[in-house]
Amino acid sequence: MTDLKASSLRALKLMDLTTLNDDDTDEKVIALCHQAKTPVGNTAAICIYPRFIPIARKTLKEQGTPEIRIATVTNFPHGNDDIEIALAETRAAIAYGADEVDVVFPYRALMAGNEQVGFDLVKACKEACAAANVLLKVIIETGELKDEALIRKASEISIKAGADFIKTSTGKVAVNATPESARIMMEVIRDMGVEKTVGFKPAGGVRTAEDAQKYLAIADELFGADWADARHYRFGASSLLASLLKALGHGDGKSASSY
């Protein structure tokens, strides 16, 4: 197996196959569930808006892949600093049956100098998730933070407040995941000594098998080749799947989605 084939198979099994569009429908989510079951293995999860969780759960069960996890988003995409609303949305997502919640960190508050609200928001959402055995990923929106010190600070605050994963981006801003921001965030995980318990998720802009290979290489360099499993690493993407399947000899590499 070539290096690209090997990394593509790894990446496929680490995907949170995503649709987070204003025009999402039951039909589109059902199609996403079907796509998550591929000839070479299943994606780790799908990521959808909370209202679609019941139809996704039903579809995944009916197609014989109940092990594919369902992730959803809260405080999304703007990362507001109202803790009560973020917590209410997170509790609602859990009630819908989410296995994982990706919550947006109040990054604009951090940019304005307020570190406390981010900590308090993540901590509140973590307590709700932990009580239901739901994984919490925290989106810090690196493309808006821009500054390395702010990316580092948002990562540290999220981890201290209980994040199970730190995630680069919503996919809804001009700049999403980059290898540079990925390295900074994973270095925080390493420097804090939490690589056993905290994972990393690049999202938005990871579109090709070659892109995925680059991101996995950074993880392998920092943590060794065994670290990036589904408990420690995910790709938030949709169009990536077609490219990975093409690299693995399935399909033409074309995708209907741009995430």
From Swiss-Prot:
Catalytic function, reaction form: 2-deoxy-D-ribose 5-phosphate = D-glyceraldehyde 3-phosphate + acetaldehyde
Protein name as annotated: Deoxyribose-phosphate aldolase
Gene3D superfamilies to which the protein is assigned, alphabetical: Aldolase class I (3.20.20.70)
Classification via CDD domains: DeoC
Organism field: Escherichia coli O139:H28 (strain E24377A / ETEC)
Active-site positions on this chain: 102 (proton donor/acceptor), 167 (schiff-base intermediate with acetaldehyde), 201 (proton donor/acceptor)
GO cellular component, one term: cytoplasm
Superkingdom in the source lineage: Bacteria
Biological pathway: Carbohydrate degradation; 2-deoxy-D-ribose 1-phosphate degradation; D-glyceraldehyde 3-phosphate and acetaldehyde from 2-deoxy-alpha-D-ribose 1-phosphate: step 2/2
Database matches in PANTHER family: DEOXYRIBOSE-PHOSPHATE ALDOLASE (PTHR10889:SF3)
Primary gene name: deoC
Molecular functions (GO terms): deoxyribose-phosphate aldolase activity
